[in-house]
Amino acid sequence: MSKARRPNLRRLLWHAVYEFLARTMKHEEWTFMNYGYASVQPGDVDLKLAGADEPDRYHIQLYHHVAGAVDLHGKDVLEVGSGRGGGSAYICRTMRPKSVTGMDLARAAVAFSQKRHSSPGLSFVPGSSDAMPFDDESFDAVVNVESSHCYGPLQQFLSEVHRVLKPEGHFLFADFRSRAEIDALRCELKSSGLALVRETVITPNVFRSLELDHRRKLELIERFGAPVRSYFDRFAALQGTDMFESFRTGENEYISCVLAKP
């Protein structure tokens, strides 16, 4: 198969995976799919959460780290790759934006999110990261958390981010790559036409989250049947999987970035 087709194949494969997840995993309490973020510095104060949010603490802390990097009060916010909607819903109810639109390629995930999350100013729509169904300069901020590794090369996605952002808007990004691929990701971000305001390596925070959240995720995954159990172990980067080890050894590096449109 030619290299030109590989990005499309990657997108199709991940699309199939997330459609399957959304259609088969009906547990309404499962609204986040990221690896999470935990403090690693002595003396760091835990994020204050409502009691209902406590089970999702580490997932929420990643969204707080990424989306909380700029003031979203009164802003129109887009999340690309909103999954099961927990991140968009958290941003909407805690950061006082004017609106939050969650967009995902998997229509089943969009349908789940529409049913599961209801809040003034919050909506979910189907759409592709490389052809967003929005007018130019529609949003003050675009959020993208742990999703871009499913896209292949990012040039078209970043072009779309640039297009839908208003002048002086922000792109709030977090994802991981292998040690061999991380510099290519940085180059793609640098050549996007957006100005890099800040980059933070958060691999230790993500790995600590995987350690602390292991038991809760294991108990959730044990509800699934044996045929898919081993797949979900790896998907969730449970202890003992190669994904868990890749963050422990640094083979995978996780970064968060704030970029601004001039």
Mark where each language-model region is.
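A short acidic, Gly/Pro-enriched loop at the edge of an enzyme's catalytic core
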Residues: 130-142
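A short SAM/SAH-binding and catalytic strip from SAM-dependent methyltransferases
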Residues: 141-152
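A short glycine-rich, Lys/Arg-flanked "PGG" loop and its adjoining helix->strand segment in the class I
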Residues: 155-167
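Conserved beta-strand signature within the Rossmann-like core of class I S-adenosyl-L-methionine
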Residues: 169-175
